[in-house]
Amino acid sequence: MKFPTVENAALVMIDMQQKLLPAMNDPQTVLELNILLLNAADVLKLDILVTEQYPKGLGNTVPELATWLGEKTPVIAKTSFSVFGSAEFCAELAKRKREVLIFSGIESHVCLLQSVLDAVERGYEVIVASDAVMSRKFSDCHAALEMMRSKGVSVLSTESILFMLLRDAAHPEFKTISKLVK
């Protein structure tokens, strides 16, 4: 496995939208962990890409997350379940020249699963923040995570991913990230 760094990785947050999130099993935890990921990505200067599945019908990214998105963060509308079905997403990702993709968002068994499988097929090193993803039914989420693992995806907690990005307590942002996870 290739360790994620701010130089080689990007966070891909999938479809954390106004009409989707409330339908999830444990939406509050998923929301809080995605806020943590965005906050940490901001501190670490990690590239972020955000998608919205058919925003006309499902709404935009929830305000609690949208406030963390900077001007440089593309929010990409899509209709394909996989982010790789969006030419705009592919173009934005290509500009960033990243090798490692860290995924979070919803729904685990639909858009997230198809995006992750496409990323693996395209040769990316893929990490999924297992506690920052969800489906309406826990069983769907569990099955999707198992499928991802079987394809060589690293399925880790948000906290594990953040400390992998730091690699060392001597990292200049170690104290800041440590405070965020407590």
Model region roles, listed by residue range:
Residues 1-10, 43-44, 56-182:
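Active-site-adjacent betaalpha module
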Residues 6-9, 25-49:
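A short alpha/beta connector and helix-capping loop motif
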Residues 9-17:
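Active-site gating/metal-coordination segments in enzymes
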Residues 13-14, 48-53:
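Short beta-strand segments at enzyme active-site cores
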Residues 18-22:
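Short acidic, Gly/Ser-rich segments with clustered Asp/Glu that frequently serve as metal-coordination loops
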